[in-house]
A protein has these predicted regions:
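A glycine- and small/hydrophobic-rich beta-loop-beta segment
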Residues: 230, 238-314
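Conserved small-residue-rich beta-alpha loop and adjacent elements
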Residues: 76-142
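C-terminal core of ALDH-fold dehydrogenases
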Residues: 291-399
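N-terminal Rossmann-like NAD(P)+-binding subdomain of aldehyde/semialdehyde dehydrogenases
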Residues: 1-92
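Alpha-helix C-terminal capping segments
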Residues: 111-122, 145-147, 165-171, 189-191, ...
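Short internal beta-strands
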Residues: 122-131, 236-242, 249, 320
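Conserved NAD(P)+-binding/catalytic subdomain of aldehyde/semialdehyde dehydrogenases
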Residues: 148-219, 223-226, 230-235
Length: 399
């Protein structure tokens, strides 16, 4: 993987096209690497109108939610003439990676592009691998166009990450790279971190349901399986104060497996990382919840809002029996790019702040600095930084 990045950095488009031909069996040129307006129009003709409508409805909710996250620059003028503040500036450019293959995830396109757009990022570059014919999944193109991508390129894998991080003749370097991908994409993002910013290294999907005897076992089982179907490394955990509920959920799971299309993946996922844990008290259950710090947490108990106040660690919290996890994946509005592998203890969901940088503002008048210049000089001298002290002192040499 590092070799791919090194070649992209050294050879640019030449290496990018070679790796695309090698891995995606698609020959690209400078004239065909970027998705055209005609290709976007053609994508709309291939996508059902019902899906386009749903994408637009979801987009409204996602945009509305992220608009509430925006923060303005602020300034604080003090009586002595001092002005302190914080200037908010959107990143100039962002790269969004979208997986290709047989599966299309337009929801992921929306979740990664919308917060960048709301933040004010002017250049949003999406990359996604093409098929052998040099085409991109139509639903992916429709979602990208609706969300506001400014450039779309037909490249994927570690080579696409390298192009975004270092730039090539066809693709300009960006300031930050976001979006999910396979292990090679994840490792490539990790390798270029520091040269550009990245969102996170996402792990397998996780769900934890905290439930008591008021929960509907039919619903709980369905929600656990909604994440177990992602892949064999996904985790699905029920923490409950009711032994009876745990037994009923197990029965419901066995019934669902007989009719779900991805039953084989689900069975392996549950075998690897599926658990039903019984706690004696709700407080004990909450200790487990906070220790695991799941990507998705559902609270299905009596007084769920009260229980929610005791949760310290979770990526997204779904409250009540009708707030099923897929609601957050597709439609509610909060971002579905969430911390995994216990990182919800210190990381947050993807949000507008991820696409903004903050600059501190400091202004002192002569009188304001004069009042405290001796204090600064004392500090600097104590640290042995005489040039620091001199930088302040020279302004008052004649006084």
């Amino acid at each position: 993987m590092q070799g791919i990045l090194d070649e992209i950095k050294e050879k640019g488009d030449e290496a990018l096209f070679a790796y695309t031909e090698k891995f995606d069996k698609c020959k690209l040129t400078k004239d065909t690497i970027q998705v055209t307006e005609e290709e976007i129009k053609a994508a709309y003709e291939k996508v059902d109108d019902s899906l386009v409508e749903v994408i637009r409805k979801s987009l409204v909710n996602i945009r509305e939610y992220h608009e509430k996250q925006k923060r303005n620059s602020w300034f604080d003028a003090k009586p002595d003439g001092t002005i302190l503040g914080q200037k908010m500036t959107a990143l100039a450019s962002v790269g969004v990676y979208v997986p290709g293959g047989k599966a299309a995830y337009p929801s992921s396109v929306l979740m990664n592009i919308v917060p960048a757009k709301v933040a004010g990022v002017e250049k949003i570059v999406m990359v996604t691998p093409p098929n052998k014919e040099g085409e991109v999944t139509p639903a992916t193109l429709v979602a990208a166009n609706e969300a506001g991508a400014t450039h779309i390129y037909k490249v994927g894998g570690a080579q696409a990450i390298g192009a975004l991080a270092y730039g090539t003749e066809s693709i300009e370097k960006v300031d930050k790279i976001v979006g999910p991908g396979n292990i090679y994409v994840a490792l490539a993002k990790k390798a270029v971190y520091g040269h550009v910013s990245i969102d996170s290294i996402a792990g397998p999907s996780e769900i934890l349901v905290l439930a008591d005897d008021t929960a509907n076992p039919h619903f709980v089982a369905a929600d656990l399986l909604s994440q177990a179907e992602h892949d064999e490394l996904a985790s699905a955990i029920l923490v409950t104060t009711s032994k009876t509920l745990g037994e009923k959920v197990q029965e419901e799971i066995e019934g669902y497996l007989k009719k779900l299309s991805r039953a084989e993946i689900i069975e392996k996922s549950l075998e690897n990382f599926g658990y039903i844990l019984e706690a004696e008290t709700l407080n004990e259950a909450l200790e487990v919840v906070n220790a695991i710090a799941s990507e998705h947490l559902e609270i299905v108990t009596a007084n769920p809002f009260e229980v929610m106040t005791k949760v310290r660690n979770a990526g997204a919290i779904f409250i009540g029996e009708y707030s099923s996890e897929p609601l957050g994946d597709y439609f509610a509005g909060p971002n579905h790019v969430l911390p995994t592998n216990g990182t919800a203890k210190f990381f947050s969901p993807l949000n507008v702040d991820d696409f903004v940088k903050k600059s501190s503002i400091i202004y002192y008048s002569k009188d304001a600095l004069k009042a405290i210049h001796k204090d600064i000089e004392t500090f600097a001298q104590a640290e042995g930084l005489t040039a620091h002290a001199n930088s302040i002192a020279v302004r008052f040499e004649e006084e």
